[in-house]
Amino acid sequence: LVIDATHPYAQVVTANIRKACEKFPHICLLRCLRKESEDEAKDSKGDKNGIIHVKNTAEAVRYLSEKEGNIFLTTGSKELVLWQGLPGHLERIFARVLPVEASVHICRELGYSGRHIIAMQGPFSAEMNYIQLKEFQCSYMVTKDGGDTGGFKEKMQAAKKAGATAVVIDRPKDKGMSLEQTKEAVKEWMKDVSE
């Protein structure tokens, strides 16, 4: 039995797990999906209540290329290179990344320095997100829906309090089951193997 409970945006890891399990037909693979956050509804323009939903990072870059104002980027360093197409990116972006040398190195290689690199380990409280939004005078917060364990709700609260627009990169579509369904499937699997 293999349970893939990786981060909802870890598509490469999930693909590798599936590929490895396909080599062994006797292995049962379960994909446990984190519950998505419930943010406020969107209107037909997709921008009600200061929340914009985009499909991916490239779409977020396109959207923000047409806007002015600083950007609090909470999506880490892995896709930071995609933001080089944003006009004024080195001045506008404040990137919060993991406090590890590899993440900081990526930021520096791309030209970011000083206060534009925020190396901290989350998840963060709504107050900490709010303080950072205000400190860097950000009009936008870019995030992914990491669910409750990823601090998504706190980010949305902070953006609303700060008057910043939240640009949410939606989760990739994936098939799987909830935590509760996964628990039940494991129980059934345990019954089957013990008989």
Enumerate the language-model features and the residues they cover.
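A C-terminal functional module that forms or caps the active site or interfaces directly
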Residues: 108-131, 135-136, 140-162, 171
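Short hydrophobic alpha-helical runs that function as membrane-insertion/retention elements
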Residues: 3, 30-31, 142-143, 166-170
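A short helix->loop->beta-strand "cap" motif at the edges of active sites that frequently abuts
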Residues: 22-29, 91, 161-165
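Glycine/small-residue-rich loop that forms an oxyanion/phosphate-binding "nest" at active or ligand-binding sites
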Residues: 1-60
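Anionic-ligand binding region
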Residues: 69-70, 74-116
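Short, flexible loop segments at boundaries between secondary-structure elements
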Residues: 100-103, 166-177
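Structural motif
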Residues: 1, 70, 139-140
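Short acidic-hydrophobic, aromatic-tinged amphipathic segments that line or gate anion-handling sites
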Residues: 49-57, 178-188
